UniProtKB/Swiss-Prot annotation:
Gene name tied to this protein: yohJ
Annotated source species: Shigella flexneri serotype 5b (strain 8401)
Protein name: UPF0299 membrane protein YohJ
Membrane topology: Multi-pass membrane protein
UniProt GO cellular component terms: plasma membrane
Protein's cellular compartments: Cell inner membrane
Keyword Plastid attached: no
Source organism phylogeny: Bacteria, Pseudomonadati, Pseudomonadota, Gammaproteobacteria, Enterobacterales
Length: 132
């Protein structure tokens, strides 16, 4: 019985922490003068807490595993909602594809530039350099 209660406690703690970050993000988003989704702010809060090791990762792991396992199921309502606008999407197919391609290219460029900025140029092991 004790093992069962321990497992229940681990899942309960994980979901309470995840939802606490979510609702903190929603609250902060309601105070901001700009429109930023509360779920994004909540995710950033959770990421900061995990990165600074204020919140141990083992506390949220059980809840994360459950959410990842059933992630495909969580996208079904979104897919059904998109199908309501199928005619509009078909009429605007070209601009949608172009905007997706351009935004993907912009993301690639920004990530590569910021990675280069953070990590700098590194010498490959075994590569001959100018230091001779």
């Amino acid at each position: 019985m004790s093992k069962t209660l321990n497992i229940i406690w681990q899942y309960l703690r994980a979901f309470v922490l995840i939802y606490a970050c979510l609702y903190a993000g929603i609250f902060i988003a309601s105070l901001l003068p700009v429109t930023i989704p509360g779920s994004i702010i909540g995710m950033l809060i959770l990421s900061v807490l995990l990165a600074l090791q204020i919140l141990p990762a083992k506390w949220v792991n059980p809840g994360c595993y459950v959410l990842i396992r059933y992630m495909a199921l969580l996208f079904v309502p979104i897919g059904v909602g998109v199908m309501q606008y199928f005619d509009l999407l078909r009429a605007q197919f070209g601009p949608v594809v172009v905007s997706c391609a351009v935004s993907t290219l912009v993301v690639f460029l920004v990530v590569s530039w910021s990675s280069q900025l953070v990590h700098g140029e590194r010498k490959v092991v075994g590569q001959k350099g100018s230091e001779e």
